[in-house]
Design a protein with these regions (language model features):
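Helical element adjacent to the flavin cofactor pocket in flavoenzyme catalytic cores
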Residues: 77, 109-161, 166
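Mid-domain catalytic core of redox enzymes
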Residues: 151-269
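General beta-strand structural signal in soluble alpha/beta enzymes
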Residues: 87-89, 146, 177
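Rossmann-like flavin
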Residues: 3-102
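Alpha-helical scaffold segments in soluble metabolic enzymes
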Residues: 74-78, 132-135, 187, 214
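FAD-binding beta-loop-beta segment adjacent to the flavin cofactor pocket
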Residues: 98-106, 263-271
């Protein structure tokens, strides 16, 4: 299945797999767009410091539209019957640390963002975005310390006063921790300053890691697109193996990225 960039072509694709597929897709995406807008307006910009943030008037008024009590799989199957279309819409949820059966219908907002709004590729790769941000920061006086592993966040009187690294201790006015929450709490803070104990983190379902292969091919691969998802095995079984039985999948699904399809100079001539 080739997923085009054009929305009209995507609608034609859904029509080719299922009767009235385009109409069903538009209804599905209209609903997903509402979830996306609600999430962006009322949840995304909240600091996440207290559960009371969820009790705002606008959030409560729109709560039923988020479908938090309906599974994402059930929501998809209300719209579509074709197994390939179902797999296409279910796949992104695997990266959130859950399955379509367990995750709420709210997660349809991911399909809205990826399929309806579109997926974009910065020329030079995503590292170029980081490089550009770093350049802007440097022009504004920011100093970067690279290869500087943080080993501890030091707290005095309930206030962070410094950060220890393997090389030095740095006094701080404030700290922004962009690492994994569980890592910061359990590895960098003293126990008395942690919000959650080890038992809590052990009971959580984390988003999965990935096994990555970087492969160079000495010829052009005509049947690959920039992004290719292989749905030739049972996705429901895959989800059960990852999240329920917690074993290495017997027949894993996989994703292939071939960026030279969009930017030819990433590979030598005639190669991928």
């Amino acid at each position: 299945m080739t997923l085009p960039a054009s929305w009209n072509e995507i609608c034609d694709l859904f029509d080719s797999y299922e009767e009235n597929g385009a109409n069903k897709l538009n209804k599905f995406m209209d609903d997903a767009e509402k979830k996306y807008s609600i999430g962006l307006r009322f949840l995304y910009n909240s600091p996440g410091l207290s559960i009371t943030e969820l009790f705002k008037k606008d959030v409560l008024f729109n709560a039923n539209k988020l479908q938090l009590l309906t599974s994402y799989r059930k929501h998809i199957k209300r719209h579509f019957k074709n197994p390939r279309l179902i797999s296409l819409l279910e796949f992104p949820v695997l990266f959130l640390g859950t399955s379509a059966e367990s995750g709420p219908a709210l997660y349809s907002l991911m399909s809205y963002s990826g399929i309806k709004q579109g997926t974009f590729y910065p020329m030079g790769g995503f590292a170029k975005v980081i490089d550009s941000m770093a350049e802007i920061c440097k022009k504004n006086g920011v100093k970067f310390l690279l290869d500087e592993q943080v080993t501890k966040i030091n707290v005095l009187n309930k206030k962070v006063e410094s950060v220890s690294t393997k090389n030095q201790e740095l006094a701080t006015n404030f700290v922004v921790g962009a690492a994994d929450y569980a890592h910061i709490e359990s590895k960098l803070l003293d126990i008395k300053y942690q919000n959650y104990d080890s038992a809590y983190w052990e009971s959580r379902e984390f988003s999965p890691s990935a096994l990555l292969f970087y492969i160079g091919v000495n010829k052009k691969l005509k049947n690959l697109e920039h992004h290719t998802l292989f749905f030739d095995e049972d996705m429901e079984k895959l989800s059960q193996e990852i999240y329920d039985t917690k074993v290495w999948p017997e027949k894993p699904l996989f994703y292939t990225c071939c960026p030279a399809k969009s930017q030819e100079d990433l590979a030598p001539d005639g190669k991928e």
